[in-house]
Curated annotation (Swiss-Prot):
Assembly mode: Interacts with ISU1 and HSP70-9/HSCA1.
InterPro entries in UniProt: DnaJ_domain (IPR001623), HscB (IPR004640), HscB_C_sf (IPR036386), HscB_oligo_C (IPR009073), J_dom_sf (IPR036869)
Protein purpose: Co-chaperone required for the assembly of iron-sulfur [Fe-S] clusters in both mitochondria and cytosol. Required for the activity of iron-sulfur proteins such as aconitase and succinate dehydrogenase. Involved in iron homeostasis and may take part in the control of iron translocation from roots to shoots.
Taxonomic classification: Eukaryota, Viridiplantae, Streptophyta, Embryophyta, Tracheophyta
Highest taxon, organism lineage: Eukaryota
Main location as per UniProt: mitochondrion
SUPFAM superfamilies assigned to the protein according to its UniProt record, in alphabetical order: Chaperone J-domain, HSC20 (HSCB), C-terminal oligomerisation domain
Localization per record: Mitochondrion; Cytoplasm, Cytosol
Family listed: Belongs to the HscB family.
Descriptive protein name: Iron-sulfur cluster co-chaperone protein HscB homolog
Ranges where the J domain occurs: 93-165
GO biological process, any: [2Fe-2S] cluster assembly
Amino acid sequence: MKKTKTMVASISTLIRRTYPSTNQCNSLATIQSQTQLPRESLQHHSSAEGRLRFSGRVFCSESGAGCWNCGEKAAFLFCNSCRSIQPVDDSVDYFQIFGLEKKYEIDPGSLEGKYKDWQKKLHPDLVHNKSKKERDYAAEQSAKVTEACRTLTKRLSRAMYIMKLNGVNVNEEETITDPTLLMEIMELREAISEADDSTSLNQIRSQVQEKLKQWSDSFVEAFESQKFDDAVKCIQRMTYYERACEEILKKL
């Protein structure tokens, strides 16, 4: 137990270290050249956008595709003309599904509420009298809505997704050679391994979540400034702390 407390204190010291601002993301002390990511890790692509349309609590997105049944312009889920369930439209992004502004910072409560509304509309009991084709479409829509909610709920996956929408695919597995960060991660993993009770684990978890939030905040600053190289580095650091949280949850 004494050793565990010592390791927890070590992590506390790590958390209290001076945290680099976004402007410092690309140069941690004197090791800038070691942390520079290769350009090959960034792949650009274009993304299609639909038009948001709101009616009461109904949030949907229209695309250029017409209804498969009647040919009218169809919404994300149901055709407004014949009420046929529509197939998944890949041009509708995750933010549009929930009627959210396309930005990194979101309201978790709003996301959860709209997710539940979508799931009610897609519940098997409500579509059981539809054709097999439409029931299959409903199942596919439900899977996409669930994946969209899961992606937008977590800081890391949301950061990667919004970067993708802006034409940058992030390889979060890119090897980081920053010795300072690698030392922090090594000490963090050791602390998690040595922790032998829920109190110690929850204490470490709280500190790791603080670190994760700090890098998340730096990502926001870099992303909004369109400093995508810095944003990528923030995401890769967020990846390490996200995995640390997962390791802790497995032990709790």
